[in-house]
């Protein structure tokens, strides 16, 4: 669906997603070609949850487009408590050209997008992390040359990152396998939606079987923000799901390692893998800015800026 918003990758068509990657690649190669779409304009960046890479990369993306990023902490506005999400969106839309938000509940973004007369972008929610996925597929394309038919294996919690990877895979022709322990699988609704878009998305509980012949092996933390009370339980549940040298050897010498960060060495990934020669994690992190810039340009153009 073509929309002046990006809440999840299924807001894009396959052609739009490919165009996003092409734009990110072109501007990365030639920063002088970046249009100043936000010249003299502000971008409201709302963060209910703490952020490192997302905040820095998005702020720099706004600056790269000629704009002024306005960082707003969740406690400053009290979304849903002191003020409703629609009221916040309407207010910031009166003096900002775009709103981007990192929220606890995906419904907050839906409410903002429905109310705001300017584009709204998801910087992370409990359901999706689309800007991360754009950077991920940009990185995979740089590493492999093409995306169609590539095998991406995600090992770990079937969380928001895995969900956005499923939609990205469907839009690009990448074959995605998600290996998770029982009770932590990617939601079947997401799997069904991705398959309805033409995606090849498979679920398994065996990370080694999943990894065979992979072009890239991806993992994320076992315990996400807000799940700290489950840390001990999750360490037990995810035993055997560490991406280590043995698992990468099963994948094959062609396989790259990806991680959205922050990483916990000795838990979801071994130090030898993340710091090894087949790790593309730092390229992936650097691509967050290029991805954010392309996404912002896309929604701004659709929004008539």
Where are these regions (language model features)?
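Positively charged, low-complexity intrinsically disordered leader regions
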Residues: 1-56, 60, 128
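Phosphate/diphosphate ligand-binding glycine-rich loop within oxidoreductases
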Residues: 36-141, 265
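Phosphate-coordination loops involved in phosphoryl transfer and adenosine-cofactor binding
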Residues: 37-43, 148-150, 254
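Glycine-rich phosphate/diphosphate-binding loop of Rossmann-like nucleotide-binding domains
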Residues: 48-60, 144-219
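Short, structured coil segments at secondary-structure junctions
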Residues: 65, 115-116, 172, 197, ...
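Rossmann-like adenosine-cofactor binding region
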Residues: 195-272
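Adenosine-phosphate binding glycine-rich loop
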Residues: 254-255, 260-305
């Amino acid at each position: 669906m073509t929309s002046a918003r990006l809440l999840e990758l299924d807001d894009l068509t396959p052609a739009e997603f490919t165009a996003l990657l092409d734009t990110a690649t072109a501007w990365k190669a030639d920063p002088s070609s970046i249009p100043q779409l936000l010249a003299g304009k502000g971008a409201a960046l709302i963060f209910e949850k703490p952020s490192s890479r997302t905040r820095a990369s998005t702020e720099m993306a706004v600056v790269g487009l000629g704009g002024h990023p306005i960082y707003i902490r969740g406690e400053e506005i009290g979304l849903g408590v002191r003020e409703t999400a629609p009221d916040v969106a309407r207010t910031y839309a009166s003096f900002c050209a775009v709103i981007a938000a990192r929220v606890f509940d995906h419904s907050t973004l839906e409410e903002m997008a429905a109310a705001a007369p300017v584009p709204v972008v998801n910087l992370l929610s409990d359901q999706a992390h689309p800007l991360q996925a754009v950077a991920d597929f940009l990185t995979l394309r740089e590493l492999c040359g093409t995306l169609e038919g590539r095998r991406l294996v995600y090992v770990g919690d079937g969380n928001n990152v895995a969900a956005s990877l499923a939609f990205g895979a469907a839009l690009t022709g990448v074959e995605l396998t998600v290996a998770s322990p029982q009770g932590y699988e990617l939601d079947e609704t997401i799997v069904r939606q991705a398959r309805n878009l033409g995606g090849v998305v498979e679920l398994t509980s065996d990370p080694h079987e999943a990894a065979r012949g992979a072009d890239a092996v991806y993992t994320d933390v076992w315990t996400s923000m807000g799940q700290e009370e489950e840390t001990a339980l999750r360490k037990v549940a995810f035993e055997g799901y560490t991406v280590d040298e043995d698992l990468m050897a099963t994948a094959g010498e062609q396989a790259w390692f990806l991680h959205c960060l922050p990483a916990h060495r000795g838990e979801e990934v071994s130090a030898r893998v993340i710091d090894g020669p087949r790790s593309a994690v730092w390229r992936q992190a650097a691509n967050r800015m290029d991805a954010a810039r392309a996404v912002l340009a896309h929604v701004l153009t659709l929004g008539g800026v």
